[in-house]
Amino acid sequence: MAQVPIIQGGMAIRLSTARLASAVANEGGIGLIAASGMEEQELRTEIRLARKLSNGKGLIGINCMVAARAFKDLIVTAAQEGIDLIVAGAGFSRDIFAVGREYNVAVVPIVSSVKLAKISEKLGASAIVVEGREAGGHLGTQQSIKEILPDIVKAVHLPVVAAGGATCGKDIVELLRLGASGVQMGSRFAASEESNASRFLKGMYLKMKQEDVVQIDSPVGYKGRSIRSPFAQLSLEGRAPRPTVCDACLKHCTHQFCIIRALSRAQQGDAKTGLVFTGANMWKIHEILPVKEIFRRIIEEVEAID
């Protein structure tokens, strides 16, 4: 694991890029670049920039959606660039383990069940991320992280990273006490100065209330946790505009709407026609802070509890 047992969640589309990942690595954590939605050359550029900005500190990885048609090409590209780890969610892939062995890259699947945790260990995972219903984006379960974490920790003999709902030091301590080796945080870093979210989008985070957090049906085939934007409301009502152009970016798609374009519009600040993924506890965050200050406060909170 990293010097500080915190992984910054890989948030697509283009919320977590080199600037955010390197800032997290510089503080001793693991910074993830969200590869989903990127072209291969763009990903190469981001990885190289993250390496340069992190000055060899911490670890730099990528997160990629298994459901993406370009999944294998993107993880191979990252492996060729000497990435430290590959985190994969929104589906389960056996291909990733062969890539990990070929390039000697750590493979970290996102799972939500004992069954997939055991399969991951058998196939050669270096660690697993266990994601509960509190997480942002695509969800693999409707069970709380605190419900599923202890059983998975007991079932495998490799590092288990807990994901879903953590925004402060107190949350991290609770998950570590349940047996986690580390904690993945997305929302807290989405609302950072280094996040690639637009200024308008960061403003939305700070204005959120608990009742603004909803779950929509994603065309990927999973539930997706998002802010109740006008677009999300249309999706909840089954009235989201169907795509007029299709890039065939997903292996399987219901074509309810274009998830890649909806997320991209949100990242650019289009709150009306964009889909804004969020964790269940984003509404608890009231400041946009530099990554360095986020780490300082978290460490201070953890030490005060210990």
At which residue positions do the language-model features occur?
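Active-site entrance/lid segments in N-terminal catalytic domains of soluble metabolic enzymes
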Residues: M1-P159
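Active-site metal-binding loops of divalent metal-dependent hydrolases
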Residues: M11, G165-A166
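Conserved active-site-proximal phosphate/metal-binding subdomains
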Residues: A135, Q142-V161, T167-D306
